[in-house]
Amino acid sequence: MPSPPAMLLGGLLLIVASTTVAQRRGQEAAGRRRAHRVQHGQCSYTFVLPEPEPCPPEPEAFGGSNSLQRDSPAATLNLGDWPSQRMRQLEKMLENNTQWLQKLERYIQVNLRLELAQAQQHMVQNQTATMLELGTSLLTQTTAQTRKLTDVEAQVLNQTSRMEIQLLETSLSTNKLEKQLLLQGHELHRLQGHNSALETRVQALETQQQAELASLSGEKERLRRLLGRQSGALAGLERTLRAASSNSSLLQRQQHQLLESVQRLVRVMAQGPASMRAADQLFQDCAEIQRFGANASGIYTIHVANVTEPRKVFCDMEASGGGWTLIQRRENGSVNFQRNWKDYKQGFGNPAGEHWLGNEVVHQLTSRATYSLRVELQDWEGNEAYAQYEHFQLGSEAQLYRLSLSGYSGSAGRQSSLVLQGTNFSTRDADNDNCLCKCAQMLSGGWWFDACGLSNLNGIYYPARHHVRKLNGIRWHYFQGPSYSLRTTRMMVRPSGI
């Protein structure tokens, strides 16, 4: 709705416009105008005041339009005063208009000043409220940010504390491992010294044994000569006794004594050391050595048919009746079992420690007679188990040393961890298994893998505390599971029926 000053200004403009319309012709003739300008802030108001058109004298003043008048000096004088009177009237009207405009300007200025002050006050109040709202918002945001920073600081402190604790634990673990490593180093040096002492003792025992063998050989030769002399003496005595037997009881008693002496001598010769008698014999396996009288477990030499050179083997004369020929042993990881086909064919390692006798030797042994196989196992907790097969045979190299087993028994599982029939031997350079994945390369070692199978006693040797979850370790599935690497293993054979 328009304000009162605006309405008053509009009314004044309407009056001025009406006057202007009535007197437009006079204005155009005169060509003179008056303007009044009002300035208010950035806005200005300009009022144009036209000059009023002079009114001509009425016709009656000159005596009528249709009558002839005489020239009169008085009439002429009145007509000459009319413009000046009209000018005074217009000036007075202009002065009045000017006064009205000034009053209007003052009224507008006063009212506009009040409205401007009110608007400014309202604006200040709005700005103050806005600033208060902004301040409150900023304070709220600052509080929230401070809270977040406090939370982040607490999290950083917690994380720092955890990291310090982890660092301390890591440091303690490192110190513990260093101490364990130092202790293991000392233990290793001690074992090396002990091993050197044992080697020296073994060498001394070998030297002593060789000396005893030489002494026994000399004793044997001396006994042979003595036996020859005794035989000659007995022959002479027999002749003498025949001559005097009819009438000499004394000679009969002497003859009886001599016969007893000879019998004792023969028994002494028959009870000589088994090792001295075994030196002149050739044995094909440890069972023959045991039958000949040797009952001590150790290293012996055997001569296997169709094998050109004699082989040193370890004979177990105690387990399950003895007479076992070892074909494999794992105990400390000192021998690398990551070998090729040729190595597994010929054999490798030391018979007194870790070794593989050789597929060709085992094939020749098991092809001339029926053999049994015994597998002995021990885990890292000291538990022992065995698996025994009454019939064991290994095919030739042309047959890829194919495994044939039957008659399973033992404590190493409810069933065999070896495939009983038709499994070929595989190595890293000879993939003969029934899997596309090349089990020998994936699981390591040489073995009868089949389709990677349930066992592999020639896998990687893992020490204590590193022996679990090892698929490529020394495994026997039905004893300790598919990924438990065992501590020791032995495989040995002997003729069936013993």
Swiss-Prot record:
Q: Which SUPFAM superfamilies match?
A: Fibrinogen C-terminal domain-like (SSF56496)
Sugar attachment sites:
N96, N126, N158, N247, N295, N306, N332, N424
Annotated region Disordered: where?
A: 51-80
The signal sequence is 1-22
Put simply, this protein is called Angiopoietin-4
Q: Which gene encodes it?
A: ANGPT4
Work out whether the entry's keyword set contains Glycoprotein. yes
The UniProt entry lists the main location of this chain as: secreted
An annotated GO cellular component: collagen-containing extracellular matrix
Which ranges form a coiled coil?
85-109, 186-254
- PANTHER family, sorted: FIBRINOGEN ALPHA CHAIN, FIBRINOGEN C-TERMINAL DOMAIN-CONTAINING PROTEIN
